[in-house]
C-alpha cells in the first residue's frame, strides 16, 4: 500500500472495516487520526500531492464516554471493605487508596516505586510514561500503607514498595499481567459497591482529578 494511492473511498472503506471488527467509535477515531497525521507528514515532505486531500470535510465524532469518576466518599467505603481471607483483593484495595491519596498516581508508577524513591517525607520519582520528575509529599495515610508491606517486601528481597512485581527486573508482560489482575479485582469491588460502571485503576485516577477540580 502506498500513501499516494490513498483516496476518500479507501478511507471510508477502512472506517467500515474497523467498525466491522467491533471496535468502539473512539478507537476507530484514533486509527483514522493516526492515518491522517501520517498523511499530513507525507504532504509536508512532498511525498504525496497536496492538491487532493482524502480527509477533507471528514468529521470524526468522539463518542460520549460514561462518567467514570466516583466521589471521594466512596473511597471511604472501599477502605472499610473486609477481605482478610483474600490478600490479593486487600492489596488492590490498598493500591487504589494509595493511588487516590497520591494525586491519582498511575498503577505503573506505583508498581515500580522502590525504597530509593523515598526522600525524607517525599516520594520523588519519574513518570513511567513521560519521564517527568514528580515530587509528592507522603501523607500519614500513604506512609501507613507503605509500612504495611515494608517487612514483607524486605523478607522477599524486593526493593519495591508494594508486592506487585517480583524482585529484580520483570519484563513488561509481567507488568501487564499484574495490571489486568488488579483491574479484575477492582471490578469485583465495584460490583460489591454496585457502582454503575466498571471500577478500574483509571477510574481511581479520574476520580482524583475530578476532586482536584472542585
Tell me the role of every PLM-derived stretch:
Residues 5, 112-148:
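Conserved tyrosine-mediated DNA breakage-rejoining catalytic core shared by Y-recombinases
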Residues 1-66, 81-84:
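N-terminal core-binding DNA-recognition domain of tyrosine recombinases/integrases
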Residues 4, 48, 61-80, 132-139, ...:
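DNA breakage-rejoining catalytic core of tyrosine-based enzymes
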Residues 40-49, 99-120:
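Short, charged phosphate-coordinating catalytic segments
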Residues 52-107, 111:
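Basic, Lys/Arg- and aromatic-enriched nucleic-acid-binding interface segment
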Residues 11, 35, 98, 110, ...:
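Short, basic/aromatic-rich helical patch in the C-terminal catalytic core of site-specific tyrosine
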Residues 75, 140-196:
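Active-site/catalytic core of tyrosine-dependent DNA strand-transfer enzymes
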Residues 84-87, 183-214:
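Short, basic (Lys/Arg/His-rich) helix/loop patches that form interaction surfaces
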